[in-house]
Amino acid sequence: VTFHQARPHTEQDLEIYRIVVDTWNRTGTRVSYVDLPENLRTHQNTASFLDRFKVVAGNLPYAQTIVAHIARDGHYFIHPDIEQNRSITPREAARIQTFPDNYCFESKKGTPSRTLAFKQIGNAVPVCLAYHIALSLLARFADQN
């Protein structure tokens, strides 16, 4: 399985992740940016993007949308296991998007790139969704003939 390595995080991010994961695991609620201790708030913007730190909730009957922004940071995609204390890996993001484990993500000049893999995953239509859309279209075209 390729790209199953987490990105590095700052100590400040790790401290925020601990708070966010602990709160999620105890109460099932998300932490608003303004509820973080003041010493952990690095952005002046306290009016928008207050949900910038999110735990991937594996116990819900749906998955949150993986977006290309995951290539910039993993704050919207924090692993729910507090012992791991990290954002998800490209392979975990790919699994959420229903890519098979043997799928290879392309990169420039053949050099593996976590950032490019995250971009491709975030820009993709989930594989299972694309499959079912295709089946629906095929059925519709067959009905017309």
Regions found by a protein language model. Give the residues of each.
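C-terminal target-recognition/interaction regions appended to catalytic cores
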Residues: 1-145
